[in-house]
From Swiss-Prot:
MF (Gene Ontology): 4 iron, 4 sulfur cluster binding; 4-hydroxy-3-methylbut-2-en-1-yl diphosphate synthase activity (ferredoxin); 4-hydroxy-3-methylbut-2-enyl-diphosphate synthase activity (flavodoxin); iron ion binding
Family, per entry: Belongs to the IspG family.
Protein's name in the database: 4-hydroxy-3-methylbut-2-en-1-yl diphosphate synthase (flavodoxin)
Pfam families tied to this protein: GcpE
Entry-linked Gene3D superfamilies: Dihydropteroate synthase-like, Sulfite Reductase Hemoprotein, domain 1
Cofactor details (free text): Binds 1 [4Fe-4S] cluster.
UniProt EC number: 1.17.7.3
Length: 386
């Protein structure tokens, strides 16, 4: 058999590339940079001046695991609401500023943990950098330079013809250089584009040229399904190379979904401790149970579980027993019944209509034996090191 490869690796599977070394920032009490865990952000969809609605949505995001939240500030009454929101929010608040530079100073005075500025559409921004740098420096907060393919500086559009990776990177480095000239270096950068390929290349170029922490995002990614695919592909390509320090999954959906997707992306890459993982077969003509419904019911029954548990839901005897044995808990179904596995051992066989109930009970039992909270309750705990 010598010289024949069976495709079995000789050692452990390869790991991701090491995190790219960056300077370190603090956004409120959340660290951003290579020495800190990768954080997950979202943005409120409420009118910021509606303080109660905005704080309520921030509470929902926090409970879902959001680490940092961004709020829009398009009008004077939105800026006026920032002091209360920044004070009462349980997680750091970033003010998102476009067009009007005066809102930057109001956000800093309001106590926001950071400010995102868009150099492509803030009036005469280059001429105001000195003032912004001093105000942010005096307050001890970072600035995110948020370059966006949809609002790139007209000078760069004329130079490159469109929002190319090179144009995005040049914009970001130019603006960062202006801040550095005035002694301000607490900067994070994003170079977002709606095309994941352009976005990935822009971040790769930026990562090679600077040591700023990078906020990853595919802008205008689209509805939940499309946006999840785009963000997962782009983030996976970058994070696997050690590029990226904080992420936001932009979806045309409830912002809580952004947190769920972002958290799952990080878990899938082992960049966050894994929690509940459902392994289920895609179903085929061999399936002897309704795998779709079974997997959905098990997932719903264990939603909010913080305990790291791999649950296999398999629909036939071909791959079912093997997958179930490799999981912490699993079922291999067939002939109107299911074999329940725990740590590779069959512990019982139950009728098909008792599979979901049995799996949920066993999951709780395993978690309780480990002294862990099995259901929702611990899910609001922020996992990022603060």
């Amino acid at each position: 058999m010598s010289g024949i490869s069976l495709g079995i690796p000789d050692g452990p599977p390869p790991t991701l590339a090491p995190r790219r070394k960056t300077r370190q920032l603090m956004v409120g009490d959340v660290g951003v940079g290579s020495e800190h865990p990768i954080s997950v952000q979202s943005m409120t969809t409420t009118k910021t001046h509606d303080i109660n609605a905005t704080l309520q949505q921030i509470a929902q995001l926090t409970a879902s695991g959001c680490d940092i939240v961004r709020v829009a500030c398009p009008k004077p009454r939105d800026a006026e609401a920032l002091p209360i929101i920044a004070k009462k929010s349980p997680i750091p608040v970033i003010a998102d500023i476009h067009f009007q530079p005066r809102y930057i100073f109001q956000a800093i005075e309001a106590g926001c943990a950071a400010v995102r500025v868009n150099p492509g559409n803030i009036k005469e921004f280059d001429g105001r950098v000195k003032e912004v740098a001093k105000a942010a420096g005096d307050a001890g907060i970072p600035i995110r330079i948020g370059v966006n393919g949809g609002s790139l500086d007209k000078r760069l559009l004329e130079k490159y013809g469109k929002a190319t990776p090179e144009a995005l990177v040049e914009s970001a480095i130019w603006e960062a250089g202006l801040f550095e000239e005035h002694g301000f270096g607490d900067i994070a950068i994003s170079v977002k584009h709606s095309d994941p390929v352009v976005m990935v290349e822009a971040y790769r170029q930026l990562a090679a040229k600077t040591d700023y922490p990078l906020h990853l995002g595919v802008t205008e990614a689209g509805p939940a399904f499309q946006g999840t695919i785009k963000s997962s592909v782009a983030f996976g390509a970058l994070l696997s190379q050690g590029i990226g320090d904080t992420i936001r999954v932009s979806l045309s959906a409830d912002p809580v979904e952004e947190i769920k997707v972002g958290d799952q992306i990080l878990q899938s890459l082992n960049l966050r401790p894994r929690k509940l993982e459902i392994v289920s077969c895609p179903s085929c003509g061999r399936a002897q149970v309704d795998v779709y419904t079974l997997a959905e019911e098990v997932t719903a029954g264990l939603e909010g579980m913080e305990f790291p548990l791999r649950v296999a839901v398999m629909g036939c005897v071909v791959n079912g027993p093997g997958e179930a044995r490799d999981a912490d808990l699993g079922v291999a179904s067939g002939n109107g019944k299911g074999q329940i596995f725990v740590k590779g051992e069959v512990i019982k066989t139950v009728p098909e209509d008792q599979i979901v109930e049995t799996l949920i009970e066993e999951a709780h039992r395993i978690a309780e034996e480990q002294g862990m909270e099995a259901v929702e309750g611990a899910s609001a705990e922020v996992k990022v090191t603060r």
